[in-house]
């Protein structure tokens, strides 16, 4: 067994990690989690409307959400912060919606900010992070992707057009099947392939199959994390200790 693990290039720095792996396998260490996750996992439960808590300062409340905020503040012996002045509110709106500071003496114009193309540019960044978007392949060669911008711009336009989330999700998962004659729907499926990609050509059939499985793991894992909030990467080799 040891011979198959021993580094062939006589790099002694590699021996340590292999020894640790062999010891773990031989010791048959138990899983440290006390209970295995199942269908009773908290994030898989049906959404229920919670009971709105009672508060003392009822005049401060404007909507049910305020009840929850104020109830926690009162529980900790705290009082709400004073209402922000118009200048502060304007700065918050600008930075939150478009990520840019307001001009001097600007007044809050919410509809104008939501209609600004900068709104989609700012918030698309967060979705592109979830989608593991990159404009190069990564790995050691890190080749540029000259057409990666098309998916990026589709996300920006979708946000600026206030596309419903269900359509936003469906097109990215199967736009080429749902609307095969719509170039935009096909562009949306860039979500599936916009992650890191090893540009090395496989040296044989075995390596080709391994690389294909790596690609499928990345695709399935990204879809599940993005739209289900669950990690399924581990299912490639074993049951997950924590997620169902």
What are these regions (language model features)?
Residues 1-3, 20-21, 107, 153-155:
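Charged, low-complexity surface segments at secondary-structure and domain boundaries
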Residues 1-15:
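N-terminal secretory signal peptides that target proteins for export/translocation
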Residues 2-3, 27, 42, 189:
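Short non-domain terminal segments
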Residues 9-11, 25, 34-35, 120:
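Intrinsically disordered, low-complexity regions enriched in Ser/Pro/Gly/Gln/His and often acidic
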Residues 15-30:
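Bacterial N-terminal signal peptides
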Residues 35-244:
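Short, structured secondary-structure elements
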């Amino acid at each position: 067994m040891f011979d198959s693990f021993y580094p062939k290039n006589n790099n002694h720095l590699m021996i340590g990690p292999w020894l640790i792996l062999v010891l773990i396998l031989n010791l048959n260490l138990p899983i440290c989690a006390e209970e295995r996750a199942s269908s009773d996992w908290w994030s898989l439960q049906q959404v229920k409307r919670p009971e709105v808590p009672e508060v003392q300062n009822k005049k401060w409340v404007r909507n049910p959400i305020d009840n929850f905020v104020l109830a926690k503040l009162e529980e900790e012996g705290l009082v709400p912060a004073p209402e922000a002045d118009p200048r502060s509110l304007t700065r918050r709106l600008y930075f939150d919606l478009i990520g840019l500071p307001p001009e001097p003496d600007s007044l809050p114009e919410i509809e104008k900010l939501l209609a600004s193309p900068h709104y989609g540019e700012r918030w698309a960044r967060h979705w592109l992070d979830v989608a593991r978007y990159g404009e190069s392949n990564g790995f050691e060669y890190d080749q540029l992707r000259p057409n990666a911008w098309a998916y990026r711009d589709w996300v920006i336009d979708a946000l600026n057009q206030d596309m419903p989330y269900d359509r936003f999700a469906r097109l990215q998962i199967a736009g080429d099947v749902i609307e095969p004659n719509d170039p935009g729907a096909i562009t949306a499926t860039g979500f599936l392939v916009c992650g890191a990609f090893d540009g090395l050509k496989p040296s044989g059939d075995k390596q080709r199959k391994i690389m294909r499985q790596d690609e499928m793991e990345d695709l399935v894992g990204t879809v599940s994390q993005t739209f289900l909030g669950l990690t399924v990467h581990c299912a490639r080799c074993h049951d997950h200790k924590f997620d169902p």
